[in-house]
């Protein structure tokens, strides 16, 4: 956030990798500075461009699913000593922020993008095998309600052995059920919806390969294209993930972490 503010004050538009900040106060400073200097802020949430994400967004907004009853978000990845190396920022509470900020904010963003804000949050956290690697939890269960109706849950862990397991979203709704799965929500695994036939989606780009560990989909080219189109005034082009949406993800994660005690 500090570097983004400095860039804006120097007269530049900015692109901010997730998360845009680690505290709501810092996120608000970015918003205030961007308004004061009339500069655009682009938040990087490239999973919004994956074909399953684009498809489910249209399904929700069109009302084809009807009332949303339940949403279950599961994020099970591997992040071990190959990732949390001594002397780096990974695992540092002040610089990393926690597992939800650095690893899984993409998927919290997708959930917020689809279903809106959450409330009535209940949490349970644990640190199974990262005591010597990080200053925070590696796993958690989170239950909540959606402000717009329905209930949800988030189950996550970086304690998975050796490699990523999955990032998935299961939706139970009035008119049917959907499950999007794979290592980074890259494929539709189940679709059974009233009076609807599932179309064939374009293939999802592979995940970012960092050698000993893997990340989310390689969609950053779409983010950069959006930046260029918006700043060049392309007709109808808007920021894919704007600064207020980036701030909302920070807000949701901070509320999940509020009063956290790790066992």
Regions found by a protein language model. Give the residues of each.
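C-terminal helix-rich "cap/oligomerization" subdomain common to oxidoreductases
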Residues: 28, 147, 225-263
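Active-site loop of classical SDR/Rossmann-like NAD(P)-dependent oxidoreductases
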Residues: 211-225, 241
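A general structural signal for well-ordered alpha-helical segments in protein cores
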Residues: 4, 27, 53, 107-108, ...
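Beta-strand-loop-alpha-helix segment that lines the small-molecule cofactor/substrate pocket
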Residues: 1-48, 63
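Contiguous beta-strand/loop segments that form the cofactor/metal-binding neighborhood of enzyme cores
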Residues: 102, 108-187, 224-234
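C-terminal capping/lid region of NAD(P)-dependent oxidoreductase domains
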Residues: 39, 66-70, 256-263
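Short glycine/proline- and charge-enriched loop/turn segments
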Residues: 11-12, 86-94, 202-209
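Predominantly a Rossmann-like dinucleotide-binding segment in NAD(P)-dependent oxidoreductases
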Residues: 47-133
């Amino acid at each position: 956030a500090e570097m983004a503010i400095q860039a804006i004050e120097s007269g530049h538009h900015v692109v901010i990798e997730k998360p845009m900040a680690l505290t709501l106060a810092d996120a608000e400073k970015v918003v205030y500075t961007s308004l004061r200097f009339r500069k655009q802020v682009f938040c990087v949430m490239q999973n919004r461009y994956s074909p399953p994400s684009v498809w489910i967004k249209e399904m929700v907004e069109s009302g084809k699913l009807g009332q949303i009853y339940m949403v279950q978000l599961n994020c099970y990845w591997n992040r071990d000593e190959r990732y949390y190396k001594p002397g780096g920022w990974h695992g540092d509470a002040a610089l990393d922020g926690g597992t939800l900020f650095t690893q899984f904010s993409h998927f919290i963003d997708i959930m917020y993008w689809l279903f809106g804000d959450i409330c009535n949050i209940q949490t349970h956290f644990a640190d199974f095998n990262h005591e010597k690697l990080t200053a925070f939890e590696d796993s958690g269960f989170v239950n909540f309600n959606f402000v717009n109706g329905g209930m949800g849950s988030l189950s996550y862990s970086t304690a998975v052995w050796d490699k990523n397991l999955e990032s998935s979203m299961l939706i139970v709704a009035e008119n049917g059920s959907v499950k999007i799965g794979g290592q980074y929500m890259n494929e539709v695994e189940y679709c059974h919806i009233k009076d609807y036939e599932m179309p064939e989606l374009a293939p999802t780009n592979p995940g970012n390969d960092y050698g000993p560990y893997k990340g989310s989909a390689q969609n950053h080219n779409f983010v950069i294209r959006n930046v260029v189109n918006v700043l060049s005034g392309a007709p109808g082009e808007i920021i894919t993930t704007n600064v207020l949406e980036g701030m909302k993800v920070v807000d949701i994660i901070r509320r999940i972490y509020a009063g956290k005690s790790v066992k």
